[in-house]
Amino acid sequence: MDGDCIVILFGAGVYAKKYKALLEYLNMEFDYFTDNDSSKWTMKLYGKPVIPPSRLKQFPKCKIIISSTHEQAIRKQLAEMGLADKIMSLEELYHLCGQKMTKTDRSGLDITVRDNVTVLVDMYEGIGWGGTELWAAGLAFGLKSAGRNVLLIGGTEQPSLEARYETLTIRITEQDTIMHMVELMEQNLPCIFINNFAGCAFMAAIIVKKKYPDSMHIVSVIHNDNPSLFDAHMMLSKYIEKIFCVSSQIREHMQEQYVMPNQCCYFKEQPIETDILREIRPDTQVYDVLRLGYAARLVRQQKRADLLIEFIKCLEERGFDYIFQIAGEGECGDMIMDYVRHHHLERKVELLGRLPKSEMQAFWKRQDIFINISEYEGTSLSMLEAMSCGCVPVVTDVSGAKEFITHGENGYICDIGDLKMMAQYVASLDNERKKLASFGRKCQIIIKERCNPEEYIKYWIKNLLN
């Protein structure tokens, strides 16, 4: 590329990281980010200024790389600005990656294609303890237990996992990320890459696939029903052999949006260990305080933890006694704690912080009701874990809810944001303790019948890994 050419990344959001890593792999410097969000125009990201899109016309010699899932909208915007010819596509970047691999001396690497297939499970972009990472770790461990060669790809900045998962994990640093991932994948050919985040590891897998098309297969997993996540995975769909969706609703949406054939798109109910089930409280114990449980990242995006304060207000308006235990950490934690202290609700609302996975079963066995106020989900693992312990779900109408909850029979599903109705259903369960017990038993039965871990791994081996 011309040394005088300015390189600009259009998109300063969560996907900027992987584009930065891709440019690092290519030894390509970039100069600016740009973004349509005006609140970012005074900030720097990875040391680079974020400028308004209106400034792009100031650079007659520039290349613009769209580092956002809103690719089509941004392409249209740039075309209307007369800058369509400045766009550098991902395909162009991958072509450069292919040239780099051809020129790079690989003599020091053992890239002999072996007989045994290695399954590489992507966990790199996650925070280390979110639902996607725990799902990835569980899948890897299950496949390893079934005799498959498996590695988890994680980051050095993530917290350590349980020992049984950590022994399967290769930690990649943020320096030269994609280069190290490419080398790891080459050393483990042939391999199947399980794409969970459409991030740096996905880019590395595509680079390897372009050079070894018969020895690298990619399976993409869609973990929630956010359309932007669909786009992040499907922008490079020609490199993907199969799609796995964590709910049947997501599969339906994917097939509608992308006209995908059934043989490419799969779904199986999430696995939950149900060997130790809670003994549900007898119907006669009607005087115990009702216990509510919430376990998720305390963040606004997706989880809408900022609405927990409003939900607590709605509970208080109902005038019944309860204990609401909140397990998690994040940007909304201090705000919730301040509200609880200011209104002297410490006896009713307890913030426990993030609990390790090993303590979650005990947490749910203490609760009567599972609360979820998310704006979108895949299939909530917390919900399934809680239901397996006999907790009655009172949740928003997100993906996966209707697959396990029949409204009014084993739980309640409310419109997204309808906190008053959620509080009303909680109050009704407080008044009808027999219903609380019967709903809880039904929850345990459906999880035991449909979420068998062994069957889940068999399904993956038969349908996704062959």
Write out the residue ranges for each language-model feature.
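Short hydrophobic beta-strand element within catalytic cores of glycosyltransferases
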Residues: 392-395
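A conserved mid-protein helix/loop that constitutes part of the nucleotide-sugar donor-binding site
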Residues: 133-138, 299-314, 331-337
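A short, active-site helix/loop in glycosyltransferases that binds the activated sugar's phosphate group
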Residues: 230, 238-264, 272-274
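Short His-centered aromatic/hydrophobic patch
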Residues: 195-201, 222-225
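Conserved donor-binding/catalytic core segment of Leloir-type glycosyltransferases
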Residues: 118-120, 283-303, 309-312
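Short alpha-helical donor nucleotide-sugar binding micro-motif in glycosyltransferases
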Residues: 354-355, 362-367
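Nucleotide-activated donor-binding/catalytic signature segment of Leloir-type glycosyltransferases, i.e.
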Residues: 337-354
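Aromatic "clamp/platform" in nucleotide-sugar-dependent glycosyltransferases that forms part
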Residues: 375
